[in-house]
Amino acid sequence: MGQKVTGGIKTVDMRDPTYRPLKQELQGLDYCKPTRLDLLLDMPPVSYDVQLLHSWNNNDRSLNVFVKEDDKLIFHRHPVAQSTDAIRGKVGYTRGLHVWQITWAMRQRGTHAVVGVATADAPLHSVGYTTLVGNNHESWGWDLGRNRLYHDGKNQPSKTYPAFLEPDETFIVPDSFLVALDMDDGTLSFIVDGQYMGVAFRGLKGKKLYPVVSAVWGHCEIRMRYLNGLDPEPLPLMDLCRRSVRLALGRERLGEIHTLPLPASLKAYLLYQ
């Protein structure tokens, strides 16, 4: 789980009554997964070939990083001192809902580890160690170590994220988490251990935005795996019904779909087959 730290480590878990104030906060409107996002996360991930189409762009990067030949979902940063280096994804999104998973080991983040989105004009290199993603008006980033959101950082103050944190608290972001970009609503959000953390940025509609990260740790390796996307059309009733059935069963009981008194074709549909 993502962890919330004060004097000691506290685990963010809505099922734990010890953290009832936090539980109530996370159950508030801003922390409820949007319906379309909930549906997308229930869908099987896209094929590896599609993931490659949405992976890091080896032609759109700082010279101090490179996409690995043996795993093109991962990029590697050279151990260059006093340098902050970034890379964009291959695909810029203008419409639809898109979710990708970032895997970035906590021990490889260093002082400035930032994940977010950027236009094609955002810089991908800076001298020194800095919050490069979110540094100007061309990018939007979440600093994983500081729990701060940055956009146009030279002119605008950063904001706490997740927003429920108190001033003396720190949220420990685990090795893997999800990024959700909704270009129809114009929002960027993050999901940690299945918990929707709320909207991080708004006002993104009408832009063309690419996945981006900036890093300072030598030899760090960061993986991006595109999970799936949804077009902006209204959700089909059949898809909504399928989601309702799967929710009623729960993930641990999805295997029981085969025992339901339903036609084989409907069972296959419920199982995304």
UniProtKB/Swiss-Prot annotation:
Q: Which SUPFAM superfamilies match?
A: Concanavalin A-like lectins/glucanases
Note on domains (UniProt): The SOCS box domain mediates the interaction with the Elongin BC complex, an adapter module in different E3 ubiquitin ligase complexes. Essential for its ability to link NOS2 and the ECS E3 ubiquitin ligase complex components ELOC and CUL5.
- Return the similarity comment: Belongs to the SPSB family.
* Purpose: Substrate recognition component of a SCF-like ECS (Elongin BC-CUL2/5-SOCS-box protein) E3 ubiquitin-protein ligase complex which mediates the ubiquitination and subsequent proteasomal degradation of target proteins. Negatively regulates nitric oxide (NO) production and limits cellular toxicity in activated macrophages by mediating the ubiquitination and proteasomal degradation of NOS2. Acts as a bridge which links NOS2 with the ECS E3 ubiquitin ligase complex components ELOC and CUL5.
Under the cellular component aspect of Gene Ontology, which terms does the record hold? Answer: cytosol; SCF ubiquitin ligase complex
What is this organism's lineage?
Eukaryota, Metazoa, Chordata, Craniata, Vertebrata
Q: Which residues carry this modification: Phosphotyrosine?
A: 31
Q: How does it assemble?
A: Component of the probable ECS(SPSB1) E3 ubiquitin-protein ligase complex which contains CUL5, RNF7/RBX2, Elongin BC complex and SPSB1. Interacts with CUL5, RNF7, ELOB and ELOC. Directly interacts with MET tyrosine kinase domain in the presence and in the absence of HGF, however HGF treatment has a positive effect on this interaction. When phosphorylated, interacts with RASA1 without affecting its stability. Interacts (via B30.2/SPRY domain) with PAWR; this interaction is direct and occurs in association with the Elongin BC complex. Interacts with NOS2. Interacts with EPHB2.
> Coiled coil where?
none
Give yes or no: UniProt keyword Cytoplasm: yes
Classification via Pfam families: SOCS_box (PF07525), SPRY (PF00622)
Q: Drop me one GO molecular function for this one.
A: ubiquitin-like ligase-substrate adaptor activity
> What pathway, per the record?
Protein modification; protein ubiquitination
Q: Which UniProt keywords apply?
A: Cytoplasm, Phosphoprotein, Ubl conjugation pathway
Where in or outside the cell?
Cytoplasm; Cytoplasm, Cytosol
Name of this chain's protein = SPRY domain-containing SOCS box protein 1
Q: Kindly give the InterPro entries that the UniProt entry links to this protein.
A: B30.2/SPRY (IPR001870), B30.2/SPRY_sf (IPR043136), ConA-like_dom_sf (IPR013320), FBXO45-Fsn/SPSB_families (IPR050672), SOCS_box (IPR001496), SPRY_dom (IPR003877)
GO terms classed as biological process: proteasome-mediated ubiquitin-dependent protein catabolic process; protein ubiquitination; ubiquitin-dependent protein catabolic process
Domain named B30.2/SPRY is located at 33-231
Q: Which residues form the SOCS box domain?
A: 232-273
Q: What Gene3D superfamilies does this protein map onto? A: 2.60.120.920, SOCS box (1.10.750.20)
